[in-house]
A protein has these predicted regions:
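Active-site neighborhoods and metal-handling regions in enzymes and metal-associated proteins
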Residues: 1-257
Length: 257
C-alpha cells in the first residue's frame, strides 16, 4: 500500500467529515442552497483544503445539492429550504494532491414540523443502512459485485429502486477513477473487479422512492432528477480497502461499521 497516499487521504477525509457535519447541522428552514455552498467553501479554506468539485471542468461550486426529486449534481441556487424538504449535500475536499468525496441526505425540519406519515424517515434510514452494508463488503479479496449486491438487496427489500446510470467510483489523485462501483449487480460477482489492499473508493447509495429512471433537467447540463418526480436519496463515503476490512476515510461522528 502507498502509505503516503493513505495518510494524505486520511487528512483530506477528516476535513471533509468535519465540514459535512457542520453543513448538515445548518440545514434548517429559511437557509438558501447558495448559503450552504458558501459556508462549505469557507469551512474548507479554514482547514487549508480546497474544493474538489471546483476542479471539475465547468463546475463552479463547492457542493452539489439535491432537493426532493433531484438525484445528483444539483447546482446551488437562491432557493430557500423549507420544512419537509429532503436535501442531500455532496461535497469533496482536495488536499495535498488527493481527493475525497462524501454525501449525506437529511430532512429539513424545525421543532414544529408537522407532516403526514409519508415514510421519509424510513426512506432515509434504508439508504444509509444500504450504504453501510455495502461498505462492510469492501474488504480485500471481495469483488465490486459484493458491494453492489449488498447495496441493491437492502434498497430493493425496503421497497425502493436503485438508480442504474449513476455509480460510485475509485477516488484518489482524481475525483473519479476506476473502478466503477454500481449500487446494483449486473451479471455475476466473479466477473467484477477484485478489491485489493490500498484501493480507495467512493461507495454511493443513489436511490429513489419511485421508479429508477432519471433524466437531465432542461435548463442546465448538470442537474439530474427522477423521471417520475419521486423523492431521491444520496449517501456516500470514501473508503480505504485494507487486509483487515474497510476503513472510513470520510465519516460523521455517528458513523459506525
Amino acid at each position: 500500500m502507498d502509505l503516503q497516499k493513505i495518510k494524505k487521504m486520511q487528512q483530506a477525509g477528516k476535513i471533509l467529515g468535519e465540514v459535512l457535519e457542520i453543513l448538515v447541522s445548518r440545514i434548517k428552514p429559511g437557509i438558501t442552497e447558495i448559503q450552504i455552498d458558501q459556508l462549505a467553501e469557507k469551512l474548507i479554506k479554514e482547514r487549508r483544503g480546497e474544493s474538489g468539485f471546483k476542479k471539475v471542468p465547468g463546475y463552479h461550486h463547492t457542493i452539489c445539492i439535491s432537493c426532493n426529486d433531484v438525484v445528483v449534481h444539483g447546482i446551488p441556487t437562491e432557493r430557500v429550504l423549507k420544512d419537509g424538504d429532503v436535501v442531500g449535500i455532496d461535497c469533496g475536499v482536495y488536499l495535498n494532491g488527493y481527493h475525497t468525496d462524501m454525501a449525506e441526505t437529511v430532512r429539513v425540519k424545525s421543532s414544529e414540523l408537522k407532516v403526514q406519515n409519508d415514510n421519509i424517515g424510513k426512506f432515509l434510514k434504508i439508504g444509509k443502512t444500504a450504504m453501510f452494508e455495502a461498505i462492510r463488503q469492501a474488504k480485500a479479496g471481495n469483488r465490486v459485485g459484493d458491494i453492489s449486491c449488498a447495496m441493491q438487496g437492502v434498497i430493493e427489500e425496503g421497497g425502493y429502486s436503485v438508480v442504474r446510470n449513476l455509480v460510485g467510483h475509485g477516488v484518489g489523485k482524481n475525483l473519479h477513477e476506476e473502478p466503477e462501483i454500481p449500487g446494483y449487480l449486473a451479471g455475476k460477482i466473479k466477473n467484477t473487479p477484485l478489491l485489493k489492499p490500498g484501493m480507495t473508493i467512493a461507495i454511493e447509495a443513489i436511490y429513489n422512492m419511485g421508479k429508477k429512471e432519471v433524466v437531465y433537467t432542461e435548463d442546465d447540463d448538470w442537474t439530474i432528477v427522477t423521471e417520475d418526480g419521486s423523492i431521491s436519496g444520496l449517501f456516500e463515503r470514501t473508503i480505504l480497502i485494507t487486509e483487515k476490512g474497510p476503513e472510513l476515510l470520510t465519516y460523521l461522528k455517528t458513523d459506525a461499521l
